[in-house]
């Protein structure tokens, strides 16, 4: 609404300086004469948009059912191995084969591209970035640790570290970014006089590109991850956006927590999960900054805090403006069950920018039905095979994990849903699927 106000203010201001603008009290314009006002109107629109580009962009994601046109992904590589050898510590469910996972991911990208979607990968962006930008990034990544005084040995000095970075090839710089190495140095009486332990904190969860940021109608917001294992991923995604020429509108800081799997845009509404990975402080930071760009913010409050349903998109998802899915344990829960989900509904205040609490503790199912959604239930069997974590690429057109039940296949068919079944048997062992592996940057509004 405030963009419309800005438009009319700009319109009147420009009119004052337009010499051929007729007085308002005697305006009588025929069709031919009105043509001369077209440039004036266009100027006002451009002026209004310039002050808030993202709010005027027709490509910014507004609804999950809008046609996806550009997606950011990351095909996992050698950084995944350390996570696979101790899955639980890496936030994974089971061990899985690293090479097979990469093949699955590339196949998924090919399926998306076959639908006319531009897929950009983190590796491609790093390969195209200026090499000095990579060196600057790596200077904050590669660490030398030692109790040795720098004056006692060249190998522990910061100048030696920087000299080494200055000689690195592009591929080795990218390895540093993905593996996050630390060299722990000690002295020895033999050979070069120094030895080391080589430690790594690889970005093994990076292939879940849904989580490090969210793409709202206003623009990109950099998240603040709930887990220490994933904290460095947001820096890399912010760097990728910079290389793409995208300036994020906000970064969540301090005690605020936000992960992208908790955000689902739905036209004039935003659904945002509040629970295991995203907290109310993170959500409030977005609302205070007017970062959502939706008139209504629906905070979905989860009290179960279960790893299998860590994000909103693991138990709720949207296929079209009037069709969604919900796992059966949430659909049939009572207020005595840990699976019971309620929502707080925030709406725009009178200033058109801030939000106010309009409704509190409304049962999620009742709210969804009240705004016109039909709900397809996801059985426990299908849920455990990540059936709910599909990606909607167009109205009633989804990319979903293959090998689901016949019952679910029939339910999709009965609701006119086109499903492309994606084989992801290795990748889903990392606790995520088709939705988690994609950050939809642009959608075409339908």
State where each predicted segment sits:
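Sec-dependent signal peptide recognition
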Residues: 33-40
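Short, positively charged and aromatic/hydrophobic N-terminal segments
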Residues: 10, 16, 20-23, 28-31
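C-terminal motif of bacterial Sec signal peptides marking the signal peptidase cleavage site
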Residues: 47-48
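The feature marks the mature, well-folded catalytic cores of soluble enzymes
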Residues: 54-446
């Amino acid at each position: 609404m405030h963009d419309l106000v800005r438009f009319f203010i700009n319109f009147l201001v420009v009119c004052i300086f337009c010499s051929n603008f007729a007085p308002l009290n005697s305006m009588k314009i025929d069709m031919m004469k009105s043509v001369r006002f077209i440039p004036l109107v266009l100027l006002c629109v451009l002026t209004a948009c310039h002050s808030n580009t993202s709010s005027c962009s027709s490509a910014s994601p507004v609804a999950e059912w809008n046609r996806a046109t550009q997606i950011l992904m990351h095909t996992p590589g050698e950084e995944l191995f350390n996570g696979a050898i101790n899955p639980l510590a890496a936030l994974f469910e089971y061990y899985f084969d690293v090479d097979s996972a990469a093949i699955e991911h590339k196949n998924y990208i090919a399926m998306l591209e076959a639908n006319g979607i531009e897929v950009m990968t983190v590796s491609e962006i790093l390969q195209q970035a200026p090499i000095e930008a990579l060196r600057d990034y790596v200077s904050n990544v590669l660490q030398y640790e030692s109790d040795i005084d720098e004056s006692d040995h060249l190998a522990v000095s910061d100048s030696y570290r920087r000299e080494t970075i200055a000689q690195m090839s592009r591929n080795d710089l990218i390895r540093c970014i993905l593996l996050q190495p630390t060299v722990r140095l000690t002295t020895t009486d033999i050979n070069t006089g120094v030895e080391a332990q080589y430690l790594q904190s690889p970005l093994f969860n990076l292939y879940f590109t849904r989580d490090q940021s969210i793409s709202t109608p206003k623009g990109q917001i950099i998240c603040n991850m709930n887990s220490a294992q994933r904290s460095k991923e947001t820096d890399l995604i912010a760097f990728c956006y910079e290389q793409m020429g995208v300036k994020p509108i906000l970064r969540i800081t301090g005690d605020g927590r936000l992960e992208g799997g908790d955000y689902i845009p739905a036209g004039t509404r935003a659904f945002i999960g509040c629970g295991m990975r995203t907290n109310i402080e993170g959500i409030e930071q977005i609302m205070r900054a007017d970062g959502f760009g939706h008139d209504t913010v629906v905070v979905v409050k989860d009290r179960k805090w279960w790893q299998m349903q860590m994000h909103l998109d693991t138990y709720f998802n949207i296929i079209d403006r009037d069709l969604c899915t919900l796992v059966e344990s949430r659909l049939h829960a009572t207020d005595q069950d840990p699976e019971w989900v309620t929502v707080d509904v925030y709406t725009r205040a009178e200033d058109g920018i801030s939000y106010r609490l309009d409704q509190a503790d409304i049962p999620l199912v009742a709210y969804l039905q009240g705004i016109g959604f039909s709900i397809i239930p996801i059985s426990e069997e299908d849920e455990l095979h990540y059936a709910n974590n599909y990606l909607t690429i167009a109205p009633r057109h989804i990319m979903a994990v293959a090998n689901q039940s016949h019952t679910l296949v029939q339910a999709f068919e009965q609701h006119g849903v086109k499903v492309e079944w994606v084989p992801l048997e290795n990748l889903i062992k990392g606790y995520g699927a088709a939705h988690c592996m994609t950050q939809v940057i642009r959608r075409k509004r339908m």
